[in-house]
Amino acid sequence: MTGVSVISIDREEQPNGPRYIADLQGLEEDFPMKLTDYKALTFDCYGTLIDWESGMMEGLKPLTSKLGTALSRNAVLEAHARHESAQQEQTPGKRYRDLLPIVYKRLAEEWGLGVTWAECVQYGKSVRDWPAFSDTAAALQYLKKYYKLVILSNVDNESFSFSNQKLGVSFDAIYTAEDVGSYKPAPANFKYMLDKLKSLGVTQSEVLHTAESMFHDHKPANAIGLASCWIYRRHNDQGFGATMNPGEMPKYDFRFTSMAELAKAHQEQLRA
């Protein structure tokens, strides 16, 4: 895989989280792709465009407020990731808004707390309230001028419809876990997307998959040779938050800490 930001990656643990060091040897010989070479940007939504971690923490307050000893934000998110990932694997056809109540119940059980099913269901509805990152809408509006914009998300259609109102653009295509019948990182989700994109006149080599999650997005993208752009939203934090640890770190072709940085880099390449 070639790229602008990195060719190969070594991981070193640092006090503020993982540090990634690019080995740029041979960069020119590899004729790396530029952002301007792609025809479509395919986005993970939650964690990349929507601040799902803040939304989760707000939605979990009725539960976490009952804890005798407060847990750190990362401890809560990591527990959520464990239960969510396990449930998605066990029931891949269950809609996300119906899966989240089970996650809420599992968290309550892990923490020894009593909850009603009504509380669990309410958490499943909280996706509609999860906020967009402050830079998302403006960046998407800029990128829309140059790319087909596509969503590949691990949610259900109804939940995404609420989030979509906060994103500021009309997407050329939206593919959800409900449509596919499975959750990322399942290969089926990426195959579904790439097959559908052919009808829009877009081939895999023209796609840049843009996402925060190494586990849900970059690892499966690596497996099929799909170019990817890492939006490293957690660059000031430790660990993987609301996503599972991917194990060996996947590679990526571009890295930015925000959508605003991605849009700025595209502008700079146009001027070059």
Residue ranges and their predicted role:
Residues 34-134, 145, 158:
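N-terminal helical cap/lid subdomain that shapes the substrate entry/recognition surface
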Residues 53-54, 137, 186-187:
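Conserved strand-to-helix beginnings and helix N-cap segments that scaffold or border functional pockets
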Residues 2-10, 20-41, 115, 141, ...:
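Asp-based, Mg2+/Mn2+-dependent phosphohydrolase catalytic module
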Residues 14-15:
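Cationic, low-complexity basic patches in intrinsically disordered or flexible, solvent-exposed regions
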